[in-house]
Amino acid sequence: MLKTLSPSLLALALFSIVVIADDNEIYVDQSGATANIDLEQLGSGNIIGGLESTAGSLNPLDLDGSSLTLDINQIGSSNTFLGDIYGDNITGFFEFDGDSNSFTIQADPDNTYGVDSSDYNVNVTGSTNTFTLNHGTSALASQLDLDWTVQGTGNTLAYNINYDGATNYTDIDGDSNTVNFTGQGYAGGYFYLEQDGGSRTFNIQQLSTLDNDYLKILSNGTGGSVCIIQNDGGTSTGC
């Protein structure tokens, strides 16, 4: 079953959709400021596209404009959310309930706006999910506020932030979860990781070149590996 939506959302637009069934697809290509976009999928095997979408060859989810609010809810297993986001003052709420889901976002990969002053909240309940976030991949993204809340086992978080001052809070409950984080830029960043569960894997790099980085980890559990690198431009290091 295929459901395709391709709106042109203008200023002060409000967009909301609920899809109930398996193997649905949502296509959104939005341009314009101050849009409020709410997407919800219930069931398994669904896709919100962009990037390199599969199934019905979607592409994109492509959001261009400032002061946007994006609310994503995928409730079920084996769902996929993919997209490119361009613009300052982006507020994102992302909720995933289920197993084996996949989330991939690039924020301003072409250095169009700089994605300054963004606020992302990601809530995950389930296991063996994979999340990839590249924020400010070409440009410095100032004053990012990023919050992850993850409950489940075997999840992987991989995020790369090219930041100009950022706050990153990650709360994980469950065993065998992995955090791969790289923060780089000029104005430093704050990263607070709180984790409960065994067999965890942390690979954390803070690479601000002209300012201080701050890292706080509270971890409770047995087994696993932790690699932390803070480097402001000195000799190459590794674990």
Please tell me what each predicted stretch does.
Residues L2-C239:
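Long, low-complexity, polar and repeat-rich extracellular regions
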